[in-house]
Structures are given as structure tokens and as C-alpha cells.
Amino acid sequence: PLYVPEQPSTLKRLLHLGSFAVSSFFPLMAQRRWRPDRIIGVVPTLFCTPGMRLLAKLSGARTVLHIQDYEVDAMLGLGLAGKGKGGKVAQLATAFERSGLHNVDNVSTISRSMMNKAIEKGVAAEKVIFFPNWSEIARFQHVADADVDALRNQLGLPDNKKIILYSGNIGEKQGLENVIEAAERLRDEPLIFAIVGQGGGKARLEKMAQQRGLRNMQFFPLQSYDALPALLKMGDCHLVVQKRGAADAVLPSKLTNILAVGGNAVITAEAHTELGQLCETFPGIAVCVEPESVEALVAGIRQALLLPKHNTVAREYAERTLDKENVLRQFINDIRG
């Protein structure tokens, strides 16, 4: 059983993550029968690391803790732990994270800045492995226009308007309230804001859009795996939106597929962060704007819409660095080390 709160709060989120750790513990222990060589734990959620370490001890396996998000840093950066870093919840969370990071054989993560953060948290540099999010590049190479048109018709999106697409989790760390504000400012232009996905913040955003009478904003459920290439190719501008303070703790996995399809993305990130540096190092790969600024977001959308719809800089970067087979081959070599 898994506890999924209808209206998330800090306590309810902790209960949600804890219930997942408890419910997965017994199936995890059953795996000791075949004595794995490596056990990989994925964060979120840190709550599962004690079970992973126990299984490793029972089976003699080596452990890898893979960090997708620094969930403690994200919690503190977004003010979800009460009194900030000095609060009791924050202190307990930080201690729990430290224990998890320091008691595994390797720590892997998805960006260079997140690798540096692991080292700052006391992990030995030789134990830290680069394991970026990948993309199945071939899936996004030849997306048929007919598939895009069919999906567009299925979703009821008009042909005469450009699509501003957000596809992914709809939670607190994204700061999607600014997308509502941007849609309101652009309501008289031939644009549709398509918000695709699920999450604890979706109902609130739908209510905000309804209260403001935003006919240029539509919400859709998460689309199927098979529909993803057509969905991403459909977008004239992709939104990769996060609040200030989250850009190095959380590197959006959605960006890899946007780059693979050659999409034009507007990324909210400070210049010094991993995402900000990506945009500076590879000019034209995306439009980087200040987080939590409606004015910057609107300007970024306008800029992205002036670009050719197929972004060759993004596409070529994805082919060089994000191909699934290459990423997995390197990771396997690293953990065999």
C-alpha cells in the first residue's frame, strides 16, 4: 500500500515517501535469494536507503546511490521544512541524507554541479560517478507529421495557434504559477498554453486559470510513452520551469527529450547553475531566463517563438552526449571499476 495525499504538505509528503519505503522493503528483501552483485538505490527517495544497505549486507553486494534530485536541498531551498536549515525537521533530514551518502560504495548523479555537491557533502571524489539522464535518441529522430497532427486533433488543439508546452510533474518546485501569469499577459496572441501531466499542484493551477478566464490555457493528463515523441514535436516552445534555488538540486529529466526532438526550450535558471552554464556553453541550445520572473518568462517565450522550430544545436548536443546506449555503457564500466 502507498499513501498518496490529495493535498500535499511537508508532513504528508514525508508520510508518502515513508509509506513507499515500508511497502517496498519486503519485496526488496526477497531479492537476497539471487545475491546481486550491485544494488542501485535511486533518490528520491532517501527513505529507501536503509533497506538497500541491509540487503547489500545480507547479499554481499556493492551499493550505488543514484541522485536524481537532492530532495533535502530542494525541500530547504523551497522553504518546505518549516524554519529553514535551523529547524528540527531540516536537521533530521540533513543527518539522514549524510548517513545515506557516506555509507554506500558509490554515489552517482546526473550533472557535474550535482557531483560537486556530493563532494561538498563529504563524499570522497573517487566514489562519485557521472550518470546523466539519457534519451532514446532514435525515437525522436523521425517523428511523422501525421502522428503530430493526429495527437493535436485528439487533444483538440487548433491548427492556427502555436503551442507553448509544459509536460511533466505539476508540483511545488516548478513554480508554475508564473506560467499562469504569462498566459494572462499573452492571452490576446495566437498561442495555446498546454499543460500536460499530473501532480499535487494541478487542481490549484486549474482553478487559477479558470478564475482568470484563460481560454488560452488547457490542461491534459499525462500522455502515453508512445505518444511522447509526437507530443514534444508538437510544441513550438517548451517550458522547463523551476523556482529559484532548485536549479542545481534538481536537474529536469524532461529536458533531455526536448533536446533530442530539437525543441526550443525556455529554461528558468540562474546563470551560475548547471542549466545556466549549459545555455552559455552551447549558444542557441535553449533560452535561459531569470527564475520567478513573469517578465523574463514572457520575454523568453517571445524569443523562443522567433527561432526556427527545429533546433539543430539542441538536437546535435543530444546526439553527442545523451544517447542511451553510450550513457549506460560508460556507467556499467564505472561501477565495475
Language-model-detected regions and their locations in the chain:
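Conserved donor-binding/catalytic core segment of Leloir-type glycosyltransferases
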Residues: 158-174, 180-183
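Acceptor-binding helix/loop patch of EC 2.4 sugar-transfer enzymes
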Residues: 5-12, 34, 59-94, 138
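Nucleotide-sugar-dependent
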Residues: 174, 221-259, 265-280
